[in-house]
Amino acid sequence: NEEEFLAGFRYALLTRHYDGIFKGVLHTKNDSVADVVKNEGTEVLYGDSYFYEELLGLKFKITPFSFFQTNSLGAEVLYETAREFILGDDKDSLNGKTVYDLYSGTGTIAQLMAPVCKEVVGVEIVEEAVCAAKENAALNGLDNCKFIAGDVLKVLDEIEEKPDYIILDPPRDGIHPKAIGKIIEYGVENMVYISCKPTSLARDLQIFMARGYRVEKICCVDMFPNTYHVETVVKLSLKKDTPKIEVTMEPDEESNYTPQEKATYSKIKEYVKDKYGVNVHTSYIAQVKRM
């Protein structure tokens, strides 16, 4: 029967030799016919239902329902790369600034950035991960992290704090196009996008680049050796308008010349809004003008 099978399974695991510490055995019930692990109840057969992992000087509580990189040493390389992309040579560049960590999971990146900025706001749709993020922040003595449970697309309309920097670490399918639009509307000068699926990344980058952002840096981290999977870190920056030289023309007194009124950014935005009912960002207008 099931109890005898589980008892034998537990015994087989406990009597083996391990280099590390054996923390626990959990039995997750799943009677679904689908090829997916759907939790219908979890039973602790031995030990604890969690363990602690240390990463870049911080401590994280990991549960079966927390998203955390399986390759811990590789995760240190990944997050150190992301931190270097964000801070660059100026370690005080985020001093006094607000950072958004969107799709924040258990808040790993948010907590790595918290010591060097005023506040980090993490948004994650999985409530268990948000609870773990709050617990981990308290564990690490970080009081400037705020984690919100909800869909990024909806939560962005509710957050009062405006970001100075945005970090993106979405699931494999990437970012919803409408969410990308809202992210771009903030007009932050720099962003870092961490992706685990190159095709989703390529699709999303096309949207960012069409709206005025450009790729400054890109780095791939081989988190899963001997597989085709790879994590990619991309730094995006908002394109600056091309430098202009101001020229003043003063026609002769006898001339009948009247300067033609030019379309300003505000007039273009007003025209598009009236004619098509669409709000356009200044950076998008600048991109079209350059084309």
Q: Which role does the model predict for each range below?
A:
Residues N1:
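Carbohydrate-binding surface patches
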Residues E4-Y257, Y265-S266:
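Rossmann-like S-adenosyl-L-methionine
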Residues Y213, G277-V278:
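Short aromatic/hydrophobic-glycine micro-motifs
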Residues T264-Y276, Q287-M291:
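DNA-recognition alpha helix
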Residues Y284:
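Residues in the helix-turn-helix
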